[in-house]
Amino acid sequence: MTWAQTIVDALKEHEISLIAYVPDSSIHQVTKIVDKDEYFHLVSATREEEALGIAAGAYATGRNAAVFMQSSGFGNSINAVAGLAIPSRIPIPIFINLRGEHGEFNIAQVTMGRSTRPILDVLGIPHYTLDSEERLEEKVNGALKLCYASREPLALCMTPLLHGGKNV
Amino acid sequence: MIESKEVFEAFQEHRGDAIVSVQGTSGRHWADVTTNQNRDISMGGAMGQSTAAIFGLALGLPNEKVVHFDTEGALLMNLGVLASIAGKKPTNFVHFLLDNECYATTGGQPVPNSEEIDYSVIAAGSGYAATYNFDDLEEFSTSLDEIMNQDGPVFVAIKVPAEVENLPIGMRERRTSRSRGQTISDLRAELDIS
């Protein structure tokens, strides 16, 4: 099974049926599966903080929602996490494609990629790094379970060692 | 222009069972007008987030009418959300915009190009199913039945007077209000969502 399919299966396991995202070539490996599966409602956002807002609203209706974005987009959405998701106690799994790691070619991605996990730490958001397929199912399922138990956002940072990254 | 309170009083007559969200200084009048607080939801506070949050709410409740009273200052912070909303075509979503041309809560500083932006044109260009623009209370009141009974997403832009607050934040009178978390729990209880 591919890493992307493992993540999609875990989403279903936790009844996460709305996925809001801003596209990225690695995330596309997940969203292309989601898009073909009628279980999911895939919502394209123009900006990452908007994806978090959509997920928060969906959760208010009893529908679990996750968001997918790049680390650069996480930079765009910090106040959506700090000002909306955390104070409203809304559990949102945030899947972040961590740019600026092994094989990065784009200097514009390096600083935010490097800063993402420290910023998550300062915000008090639990985060786990997914950098191989080893025990992936256990890691993702465990993180999602924690996210809903704690009623707080939680981040899963996916690195090129997991998904192969982007070469050009 | 139409007074915000008059907008809400006219809307209340046509609310039915709609779920209602308000935003900004103008939106505070809704608390004096609403008769079904359990179907009011607050996603405000994080300025620029509430439009997307109520859009998400509309997607999650396709069988309920969902109404959002937005402000131009908040909408401008994430104008791209109009494209996202139009792209998903939520037929149950009615998006009002109370445009007071300024950031009233911080002292009335004008939003960029405040007097010349036609937000209904931006919504129409983004692909909303129907858009309106009102400057007159009577015309607005007589159109509400149509606004509330057609397939969305519908966008309704209304110019309202600015209610500028100049008192320092710590000296302002605070209304008692439910927390955002509480409005979410109350709505979920009202809709029988576990």
Question: Which stretches of residues belong to each language-model region?
Answer:
Chain A
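Thiamine diphosphate
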Residues: M1-V168
